[in-house]
Amino acid sequence: MRRYPPGFLSLSASVACERFGFFLLTSLLLLYLNERLGFTTAQATDVLGCFIAATYVSPLLASAVTDGRFGIVRGTALGYIVAAAGYSLLVAESRPTMYAGLTLIALGAGAAKLAPQSLATRLFAAQPQLHDRGLTLIYLLANVSALVSPVIGETARAWFGWPAAFALASLSLVVASIIIQTQSHVLRSVEGKAGGSSDSGQAHGSGSLVMLLGLCVLAILFNLAQMQASSTLLLWTRDNTNRHLLGWELPVPYVASLHAGLVLAVSPLLARALLRLKIMPGLPTAAAKIALGMLATGLAYAPLVVAALLGHGGSLVGLGWLLGCLGLLSVGELLVGALGPSFVLRLAPPTRGGRWLGAWYGSTALGYWVAGRIGGLWDRVPHSLFFLGLAVLPLMGAAVSLCCHRWSTRL
């Protein structure tokens, strides 16, 4: 039986609880802003984009605290409590408390993002062979949270109202804080340890610089398209999709669960396909795999272009079009979202790996912000044209990835 180092399972459980609250919120936030607080579609998508972007910028602020005497463990526990306070403010159902709550949640999420990679690397310093499996477990638990939280959150909202859903999210963050503090003495003991060996900086020079800059551009285009699963695709599901299945109507927030479920379903199939590539000549580099992910992300919107043309005039279209889109988005998430940061660290010089990783996350934040702005076009342009634009932008990213692939084969 595989034994993980002490403290790791508690760390994983706390991450799962934190992700439960976050994914519960993102599955409901757009509808909450639009239907409950009276925001227009453009305003709601803008707020959503700014909020998610802030969760990728806030780790830079949180690192200033956790890198000092305060420490990663204390900073993470405090981040959970700050986020819990933010969720509790949403219970008030007013615009001022909503803005304050989202600010606190973004700050808390920033502190939480620092824990898994930093602490897991130190926990597995004596067992480097289990490091990747440990991170895979955290990723799996996070996706399980993404699968169940929209269902639980929407059920609570339907039965007891919006405050009940946000109260559940707040409770999950309190539980996360309690869990990590139960093993705080173990986790603090490894904070000062150096992480395991890194593959960063394997390639240097102008070629790797061009590739790193290309990856930052790619992060913008990728996340611009991926964020629509939490924004305009919910609106498409609500207003343009026939959601009736055997007499049961699929609640709109369940779309987020469908996406997470497809990620979990596609993951082993994709892993098996990539494993076969390892025994074939001409194994694709990470850049080529990322290019495939960008291609899948772009093609994901092709079914919705067709569906929008078929549904022109107000008629509802089948759920299969949406499932096709989400399935391809899941492939893109597994190839780009998972490989992108590690590829950045491999290319960056050892002394600048953190800076380039920060540039990647900064580009990710910019992509989410732009996605929120683009969402404002939902009510202004034909949906077929809107989805066509979302298809073209990731395909441009695929072209950038192919250029990176050519550079990598020359290095």
Q: Residue locations for each model-derived region?
A:
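Intracellular loop-helix junctions on the cytosolic face of multi-pass helical membrane proteins
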Residues: 1-2, 6, 126-127, 153-248, ...
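Pair of pore-lining "gating" transmembrane helices in MFS-fold secondary transporters
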Residues: 2-35, 208-232, 257, 327-331
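Short amphipathic helix-loop junctions that connect adjacent transmembrane helices
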Residues: 27-43, 231-254
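Central cavity-lining transmembrane alpha-helices of secondary-active solute carriers
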Residues: 49-66, 257-270
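Structural signature of the two symmetry-related core transmembrane helices
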Residues: 74-89, 96, 285-303
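Helix-loop junctions at membrane interfaces in 12-TM secondary transporters
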Residues: 91-102, 303-322
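Intracellular juxtamembrane helix-capping segments at the cytosolic ends
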Residues: 111-125, 334-348
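Glycine-rich segments within core transmembrane alpha-helices of 12-TM secondary carriers
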Residues: 130-158, 170-176, 259-260, 357-371
